[in-house]
UniProtKB/Swiss-Prot annotation:
Pathway: Cofactor biosynthesis; riboflavin biosynthesis; 2-hydroxy-3-oxobutyl phosphate from D-ribulose 5-phosphate: step 1/1. GO terms for molecular function: 3,4-dihydroxy-2-butanone-4-phosphate synthase activity; GTP cyclohydrolase II activity; magnesium ion binding; manganese ion binding. Mg(2+) 1 binds at E28. Gene3D superfamilies: DHBP synthase, GTP cyclohydrolase II. It comes from Photobacterium leiognathi. The gene is ribB. It is an enzyme of class 4 (lyase). It catalyses: D-ribulose 5-phosphate = (2S)-2-hydroxy-3-oxobutyl phosphate + formate + H(+). Residues 202-364 are annotated as: GTP cyclohydrolase II-like. Mg(2+) 2 binds at E28, H143. The record marks H126, E164 as: Essential for catalytic activity. Catalyzes the conversion of D-ribulose 5-phosphate to formate and 3,4-dihydroxy-2-butanone 4-phosphate. This is 3,4-dihydroxy-2-butanone 4-phosphate synthase. Its EC number is 4.1.99.12.
Length: 364
């Protein structure tokens, strides 16, 4: 089955139709049913519950979550994919038990109404909101962000109802099963990777500011500076040698961390110094992502390191943001194939949407 383009997916969303989105073209991908929230009906909710079989969720922007006064379900999210659940919700009026398809549709419509306010919903309930990251799939390549993006690009409220598609035996449906499902129900099947590519052709959340020759303790690098247009943070790329699209480039994406970079606390295999030394020797690119570190966050990290706990506060959400920003910077520099200096073998979703491919992981 041929995949539908992002434009075709967006056109169907605009017309109130349901679509299926996978991460990318891999046969191992999972898929979600997606429909724009303001187009939802009891029939759509019933279809999702009957045929999708997963957890029916509502993707919302941070701004909408703030309007509805929705708190995150947990503050320190250590889930592998940093799924940002808020407390579940119910419409405050015109519902009974809240679980019926009709009641859930009413809850969705109450939450995304143009004049919606916090008193229009109660907590907990039978609809599970997900808070999307600002910047959408260019920052986090997840179905939460994709749900908001496709609705926004269709000219609708940036919110969708989504549900994972399961097989009849309860296992996750992969691409072969998703193709059969899409053909059976007459639904378009697309990818988040294609949505990323579609958006990068029209917009970016990084702006190249300047370029310098920089003499460091580890040799001379070309320093390229960037500005993040979402939160105005400054990010950097230290480049050594010529970047060639056909050749794999040695890459490290490093997140600025006061305790690790200055106090040398909780160092991983690829510290900032180790990465600079390796790239100075072999040529490549070191991307340095800035992040806001409040005193509270620093104290929490210090306490974590003292207790020898492996995960930092909000590590999953932060990592997703860093992957999106790092990918945009690498694409801007002309990198295509990556030899990644990595501390883990965790795969990265939908990099193909940025025109990137990891061909090798280097651990030491």
């Amino acid at each position: 089955m041929a995949l539908s383009s992002a434009k075709e997916i967006i056109d169907d969303i605009r017309q109130g139709r349901m679509v299926i989105l996978m991460d990318d073209e891999s046969r191992e991908n999972e898929g979600d049913l997606i429909i724009a929230s303001e187009m939802v009906t009891p029939e759509a909710i019933n279809f999702m519950a009957t045929h999708g079989r997963g957890l029916i969720c509502l993707t919302l922007s941070k701004a909408r979550c703030k309007t509805l006064n929705l708190p995150l379900m947990v503050q320190g999210n250590n889930d592998n994919f940093s799924t940002p659940f808020t407390i579940s919700i119910e419409a405050a009026k015109y519902v009974t038990t809240g679980i019926s398809a009709s009641d859930r549709a009413k809850t969705v419509l109450a939450a995304v109404a143009p004049n919606a306010k916090s008193t229009d919903i109660v907590m907990p309930g039978h609809i599970f909101p997900l808070m999307a990251q600002d910047g959408g799939v260019l920052i986090r390549a997840g179905h939460t962000e994709a749900g908001c993006d496709v609705a926004r690009l269709a000219g609708l409220e940036p919110s969708s109802v989504i549900v994972e598609i399961l097989n009849e035996d309860g296992s996750m449906a992969r691409r072969p099963q998703l193709e059969i499902f899409a053909e059976k129900h007459g639904l378009k099947l697309g990818t988040i990777a294609d949505l990323i590519e579609y958006r990068t052709q029209q917009e970016s959340h990084i702006e190249r500011i300047s370029e310098y020759e920089l003499n460091t303790e580890y040799g001379i690098f070309t320093l390229v500076t960037y500005r993040d247009t979402i939160d105005n943070q400054a990010h950097f790329a230290l480049c050594k040698g010529e970047i060639q699209a056909k050749a794999a480039t040695l890459v490290r994406v490093h997140v600025k961390d006061t305790l690790k970079d200055i106090l040398q606390v909780g160092l991983s295999q690829w510290s900032l110094e180790a990465a600079m030394q390796r790239i100075q020797t072999e040529d490549g690119v070191l991307v340095i992502i800035s992040q806001q570190e409040s005193p509270k966050t620093l104290f929490e990290k210090l306490d974590m390191y003292a207790k020898e706990q492996p995960n930092s506060p909000h590590s999953g959400i932060v990592q997703s943001r860093n992957i999106g920003l790092g990918s945009q910077i690498l694409a801007d520099l002309g990198v295509k194939k990556i030899r990644l200096l990595s501390n883990s073998n965790q795969g990265y979703r939908a990099l193909s949407g940025f025109g990137l491919e990891v061909v090798e992981y280097i651990y030491d």
